[in-house]
Structure formats: structure tokens, C-alpha cells
Regions:
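Short amphipathic, positively biased membrane-proximal segments
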Residues: 1-140
Length: 140
């Protein structure tokens, strides 16, 4: 029998899948660039990835950020509910419970930081530094 949390988890997980699918659809053929940007550990590499995109790619890339402003909240709620449900079906230490409660907030916050920085860097290439790129890559 499904519990209330099970139903919420199913609903928020479905919302996550829909959200991720929409982000991928908006990105289209530009999707691989996201991973390249997220794993660029230097300013020259970051600039090279952005320079490899044509105008249409940049439009798609920029557009994905707006959908990705909703996505972290969705996956954060799904993860939080999943952690609560896990605590209902198995014994968890207080430390584990606290970690499971904090992890979705930390993960979503990191995604928001990555999104805001990524959007900023699209229009402010002078701010693309090794420190900014490495910090953002570590957060993402």
C-alpha cells in the first residue's frame, strides 16, 4: 500500500523527469556543451567551449538556464521526500537523518549558484577566470 510520502515521492520524481526532459529538449544538440562547461577547469577551456557554439547554440544554452531555475527546487523536494521516506522504512542515525535533510538543500543551492554564474559569464566574458571557473565547476 502506498503511503502519503510514497505518492508525493512519485509525483515529485515524475516532475523531476519532466523538468529534466524539458531542459534537454531546450538544449537539443547543445546538451553536451553543458557537461563541457561544468567540467572546464580553466578559463581558457571555458572560453573555448563557449566559442565552439554558434549563435543558435548560445540561444539554446542561455534558454536552458531559465528552466534550470525551477529544476533544482523540483529535485530538491524529491530528494527531501525520498530521505524522509527512507527514514520511515529503515532505522537511521540522527547524523544520517540530518545529512539526508541537508543534502537536497545543498544540492539545489549549488545548482542555483552554477546557474547564476553561468548566465553572468555568458554576457561578461571578462569575468571568466580560472578561480571563477574552478569554483563553479566544483560547486556543480
Amino acid at each position: 500500500m502506498l503511503t502519503s510520502l510514497d505518492r508525493k515521492l512519485i509525483g515529485w520524481s515524475a516532475a523531476f523527469v519532466v523538468s529534466q526532459t524539458l531542459v534537454a529538449k531546450v538544449l537539443g544538440p547543445t546538451a553536451p556543451r553543458v557537461l563541457e562547461v561544468q567540467t572546464a577547469w580553466s578559463a581558457p577551456r571555458y572560453r573555448k567551449v563557449l566559442a565552439s557554439m554558434d549563435d543558435a547554440d548560445i540561444v539554446r544554452y542561455r534558454s536552458h538556464y531559465y528552466l534550470d531555475m525551477i529544476h533544482p527546487a523540483i529535485f530538491g523536494v524529491a530528494l527531501f521526500i525520498g530521505g524522509r521516506r527512507l527514514g520511515q522504512i529503515t532505522e537511521l542515525s540522527p547524523v544520517t537523518r540530518a545529512a539526508l535533510a541537508a543534502a537536497p538543500i545543498v544540492a539545489a543551492s549549488g545548482d542555483y549558484v552554477e546557474n547564476f554564474v553561468g548566465l553572468h559569464l555568458l554576457d561578461h566574458s571578462e569575468d571568466i577566470t580560472d578561480t571563477t571557473v574552478r569554483t563553479t565547476s566544483a560547486i556543480s
